[in-house]
């Protein structure tokens, strides 16, 4: 959750992010130590006054801030308060201006032991419109939660680890926020990744999220763009020990379209299976052995699946591909017999098909399956098998 600088309206709160007012705490600014989960009662007496607080995260989980006041004083609040949050380096991460109602911030996910700075000041630098003398109650709440992301996880190197069969909750706090997670495959088979929207608020989901899967070399494996509802990704057929990175960020890095402050849950689970292809099988050299029925899918526009078997008898063989239901895009199916440069089969299909070819006993057979450029069946599960039909 890269909470780089943000302003968000709550009630009548003013969107300050667009004004470029973010920065750092001034070096001479002194801070008051506060204890998480205890109220601090203070007020602003001067238009230029800044009340700065310092808190240390006391447990792993998430945090938020409440700022409340006596409702009978609402007419004296005027343009309200501005609340800012800074990291341990005193770089501003979050800002909300024009707080004139009971306020609860977004959730943060700072690591245990980290220092956080919070400031409260007049929402507008004017003696006439400031909330002079109105006491506010400030509370920095911390909540224990072992399943919550931990800052800063906005780069590969800082990715949060997801345990086997585990889940993690997170959120994006601004248009530039990115969350990275890493998962190591515990068994050869297929891995399922699901994305659940915990706070389903259509007016805030807007353009939705992009969820991208990368391999250990940071090469794109699969991308789900514009997520606006719960979704489960296609099976990821990966080998034991392989590592994947999961990146979550706004589809559109524009304040008016980014799904900020909406909590999501990311779940990852691996099912052991010997019936699936094993990535990376994108070349003759890395072809998977074809024995019985193999399941596979095309995960991106450059993904190619290679399979191989050795002819046990001399005669005719039938290769069958089952593309499943409602396939809108096309597969290219190619077969090679003992010669990687000569095609014994070369067909395009959008439905279940069988192809026959001849092979002699002991000859190597390769099958290559990939999507047609611009019309690739990305994410669609298919199955492949062969059998000897006659001499």
PLM feature segments, named:
Residues 1-8:
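Bacterial Sec-dependent N-terminal signal peptides
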Residues 28-34, 51-53, 115-162, 179-181, ...:
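C-terminal edge strands of extracellular/lumenal beta-sandwich accessory domains
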Residues 54-76, 116-120, 153, 181-204, ...:
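Hydrophobic beta-strand segments within beta-rich accessory/binding domains
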Residues 40-60, 103, 168-188, 231-233, ...:
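Non-catalytic, beta-strand-enriched accessory regions in extracellular/secretory proteins
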Residues 77-90, 204-218, 328-340:
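Short, surface-exposed beta-strand/strand-loop-strand elements in extracellular ectodomains
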């Amino acid at each position: 959750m890269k909470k780089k600088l943000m302003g968000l309206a709550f009630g009548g709160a003013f969107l300050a992010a667009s004004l470029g007012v973010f920065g750092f705490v001034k070096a001479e600014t002194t801070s008051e130590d506060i204890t998480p989960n205890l109220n601090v009662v203070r007020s602003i007496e001067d238009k230029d006054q800044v009340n700065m607080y310092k808190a240390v995260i006391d447990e792993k989980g998430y945090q938020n801030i409440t700022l409340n006041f006596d409702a009978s004083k609402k007419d004296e609040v005027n343009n309200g308060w501005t609340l800012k949050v800074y990291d341990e380096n005193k770089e501003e991460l979050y800002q909300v201006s024009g707080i004139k109602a009971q306020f609860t911030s977004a959730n943060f996910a700072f690591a245990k032991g980290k220092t956080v700075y919070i400031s409260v000041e007049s929402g507008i630098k004017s003696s006439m419109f400031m909330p002079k003398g109105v006491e506010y109650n400030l509370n920095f709440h911390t909540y224990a939660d072992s399943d919550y992301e931990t800052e800063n996880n906005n780069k590969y190197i800082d990715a949060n680890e997801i345990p086997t069969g585990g889940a993690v909750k997170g959120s994006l706090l601004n248009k530039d926020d990115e969350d990275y997670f890493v998962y190591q495959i515990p068994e050869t088979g297929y891995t399922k990744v699901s994305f659940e929207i915990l706070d389903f608020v259509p007016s805030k989901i807007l353009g939705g999220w992009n969820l991208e899967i990368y391999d250990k070399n940071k090469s794109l494996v699969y991308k789900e763009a514009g997520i606006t509802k719960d979704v489960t990704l296609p099976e990821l057929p990966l080998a034991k020990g392989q590592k994947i990175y999961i990146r979550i960020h706004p589809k559109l890095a524009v304040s008016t379209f980014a799904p900020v402050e909406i909590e999501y849950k990311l779940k990852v689970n691996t099912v052991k299976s010997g019936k699936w292809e094993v990535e990376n099988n994108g070349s003759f050299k890395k072809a998977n052995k074809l024995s019985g029925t193999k399941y596979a899918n095309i995960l991106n526009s450059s993904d190619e699946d290679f399979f191989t078997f050795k002819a046990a008898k001399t005669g005719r063989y039938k290769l069958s591909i089952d593309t499943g239901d409602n396939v809108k895009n096309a597969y290219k199916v190619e077969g090679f017999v003992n010669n990687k440069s000569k095609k014994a089969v070369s067909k395009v299909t959008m439905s279940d098909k069988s192809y026959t070819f001849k092979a002699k006993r002991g000859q190597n057979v390769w099958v290559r399956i990939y999507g047609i450029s611009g019309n690739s069946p990305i994410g669609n599960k298919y199955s492949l098998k062969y059998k000897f039909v006659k001499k």
